[in-house]
């Protein structure tokens, strides 16, 4: 049994779970940590796709009561149908752009320097969103929960989500901060971001799994075990992170994450420029 491989799987699983739903970019962290662990070959890329599904399952489990209620009452409840419609509307822009330009973005921007730059730019947007929210006397008073969102609100969040196609931007950051910039309360923007992850990330993961099925990567027995371990680590850490973030946003803002992003971005730029870390991308 390769214990080093299993340790790498746990580390990457925890990184995926902790960063997928925080405004700090899971993709950016996985690229950088994957470089450091020398875990960025074809098997490593397949591994990242599969463990991402574990993080999505954590969201489904946390909000299982809401999802069951929407599913069971879809035919009879206008609120349930509007909720599903909002998710559909918010999913289309990023999924469409990803389908059209995803390969080009991966070819050009999936490397440490663009990722670090996106981290720093994202910091400035977080500061802007938090300052703007503080200056709003009445932050969309008609919106108290995700059930109050209108299709137009969903479209605005969906357009903001397009920025997440740039690695290092953060899908959750784009949707949460974008929602706040468009006037949504912080807690509502965060919860809607969780739900939006299910069709968007779930769909993207399913697409990547389909590509793996058509062009399979050979896995050894040990690597298959590493995938299982990473999947479980991603599920558990994502579940803990989602539950914590729900409570956090009720009383705090995202400024600490902004400082983290700028510090992390500067660190990456410095180590890349000086050669202290031999980034492989």
Curated annotation (Swiss-Prot):
Reactions the enzyme catalyzes: di-trans,octa-cis-undecaprenyl diphosphate + H2O = di-trans,octa-cis-undecaprenyl phosphate + phosphate + H(+)
InterPro entries from the UniProt entry: UppP
Taxonomy, superkingdom: Bacteria
Any single GO BP term: regulation of cell shape
Record membrane topology: Multi-pass membrane protein
Subcellular location: Cell inner membrane
A single Gene Ontology CC term: plasma membrane
Segments passing through the bilayer: 4-24, 46-63, 83-103, 108-128, 187-207, 222-242, 257-277
Gene Ontology molecular functions: undecaprenyl-diphosphatase activity
Primary localization class, coarse: membrane
Keywords noted in UniProt: Antibiotic resistance, Cell inner membrane, Cell membrane, Cell shape, Cell wall biogenesis/degradation, Hydrolase, Membrane, Peptidoglycan synthesis, Transmembrane, Transmembrane helix
First-tier enzyme category under EC: hydrolase
Record EC number: 3.6.1.27
Miscellaneous section: Bacitracin is thought to be involved in the inhibition of peptidoglycan synthesis by sequestering undecaprenyl diphosphate, thereby reducing the pool of lipid carrier available.
Function: Catalyzes the dephosphorylation of undecaprenyl diphosphate (UPP). Confers resistance to bacitracin.
Family, similarity comment: Belongs to the UppP family.
Protein's name in the database: Undecaprenyl-diphosphatase
